[in-house]
């Protein structure tokens, strides 16, 4: 499993998956064969998260090879990420509340040995420990393993889902505020109220080809509860028409300017905005910070090849950019 840090790598991985492995995706996608065999899934999410390739681009490529009826499950899975982003976009207080809760819970659990054992992969559950190791070493987990992991974290290890979501965001190359936060809420039973996801021994054994033993889980836990409800807000957009003398700000989740809506628009200058780890609300692993930095550098290189004046700046420097600037939407920072 190789996550190159360029748009060229993303396109290469997309083409390889569609040409060689997409035809069996629906049948094999739930199997986790381990980090050395990911041929049954696309592994494109790190690039989609950073906007290096788009969901639409991926879907169009898949439909160039197979009909919708043969391709429907893959398209559904791609669009889940789009759905979650839209859902959270309309309910931003879910993210704000999560961060506020996380701040309090961090303090409460900073000396908790159960929590330390979990993030160090030192529990009495073999598969969980292996997933912790895999997450730290590869910055990726199979989607099915993420569901099992979250369920074990919440219902067997009895740890707050907020800390688990933070642990994923710290390490995952495809860590996305929407998919990650709402996915953990869904497992806990508060995203779809009263319906939680419970990992089971038979399911883990079946879909890992019996790679693990010693899987003793709480398989009868009730869902977590929350008295908070969130109403969708109304979004309004006002795209200016004359942008020629304006600057454009591009953030780390939109790193494919050349396929975006403004690709033919001339800007005075484009600023690619990075974010130092010490300024993030969720601190990222060094490997993840490097991954993001290299993707930003690749976007800069591609823009400069088109003779577009481009500069990488830190998030804290935005205030120094003159007021005739616009940000490429959506903006996302943790």
PLM features: residue spans?
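Conserved small/polar residues in nucleotide/adenosyl-binding loops
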Residues: 333-334
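Short, solvent-exposed turn/loop segments enriched in Gly/Ser/Thr/Pro and often Arg
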Residues: 147
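C-terminal catalytic domain of photolyase/cryptochrome flavoproteins
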Residues: 1-143, 151-314, 318-321
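Short glycine-rich phosphate-binding loop at a beta-alpha junction
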Residues: 324-328
């Amino acid at each position: 499993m190789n996550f190159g840090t360029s748009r060229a790598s993303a396109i290469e991985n997309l083409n390889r998956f569609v040409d060689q492995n997409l035809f069996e995706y629906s049948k094999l996608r739930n199997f986790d064969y381990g980090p050395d065999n990911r041929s049954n899934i696309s592994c494109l999410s790190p690039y989609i998260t950073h906007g290096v390739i788009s969901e639409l681009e991926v879907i169009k490529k898949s439909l160039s090879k197979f009909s919708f009826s043969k391709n429907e499950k893959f398209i559904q899975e791609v669009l889940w990420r789009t759905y979650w982003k839209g859902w959270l976009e309309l309910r931003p207080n879910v993210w704000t509340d999560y961060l506020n809760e996380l701040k309090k819970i961090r303090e409460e659990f900073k000396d908790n040995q159960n929590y330390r054992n979990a993030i160090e992969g030192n529990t009495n559950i073999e598969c969980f420990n292996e997933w912790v190791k895999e997450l730290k070493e590869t910055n990726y987990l199979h989607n099915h393993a993420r569901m099992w992991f979250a369920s074990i974290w919440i219902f067997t290890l009895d740890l707050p889902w907020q800390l688990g979501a933070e642990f994923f965001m710290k390490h995952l190359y495809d860590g996305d505020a929407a998919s990650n936060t709402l996915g953990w809420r869904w497992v806990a039973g508060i995203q779809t109220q009263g319906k939680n996801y419970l990992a089971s021994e038979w399911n883990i054994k079946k879909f890992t080809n019996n790679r693990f033993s010693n899987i003793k889980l709480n398989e009868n836990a009730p869902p977590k509860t929350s008295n908070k409800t969130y109403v969708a807000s109304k979004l309004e957009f006002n795209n200016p028409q004359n942008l020629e003398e304006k600057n454009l700000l591009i953030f780390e989740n939109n790193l494919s300017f050349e396929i975006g809506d403004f690709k033919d628009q001339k800007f005075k200058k484009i600023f690619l905005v990075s974010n130092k780890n010490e300024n993030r609300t969720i601190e990222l692993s060094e490997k993840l910070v490097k991954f993001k930095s290299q993707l930003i550098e690749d976007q800069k290189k591609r823009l400069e090849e088109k003779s577009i004046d481009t500069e990488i700046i830190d998030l804290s420097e935005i205030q120094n950019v003159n007021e005739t600037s616009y940000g490429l939407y959506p903006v996302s920072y943790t």
